[in-house]
């Protein structure tokens, strides 16, 4: 085992394959995790069973790590995490392409194409999500940059602002037609009425699931840690996020 761990290149992905209860975690991953901690490297763990957290929390604290936990299964023992913080940071730095790339990745997590038959709904919902987020980055206050605001934007968007326009069309009509916010959202607000209503419904569904729970909405509205700390300080971050992420 020691020889195997020494051969692992930490700059590359490692896939450990084996049957259930074959000892993958105890025999390979836990020893590798020990080595990472002993080398004072930062760790991010998607820990659905909380086995890493339960086994390594005390060791991480003793080694001087800051431990942050995003746990949507146990809301009373979770730090806050706003998934829009990072793209918003890059947007404010003038790196709009980077912000849009991150938002697009997040959108495809929210709206996966499970059947991989017709990617239309996944792609158009992601585009609307990206467009709304970029519009929020441009016009919103910092405390409004969260998934709750995106959901509100969608639910209000189909309401009539006038006899001929809804609020979604009215709002984006004020935007530069060459802007990324306008282009991404235009696939929806320029669509026929029935198609537009279907897109809004599909886009709203996973967001409503998140923000419909007051405590979850609160946790996802404000980060209680600086994401820069993941590279600048010794940190262990554990995620237990069912369903969407």
Regions from the language model: what does each represent?
Residues 4-245:
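P-loop NTPase motor domains
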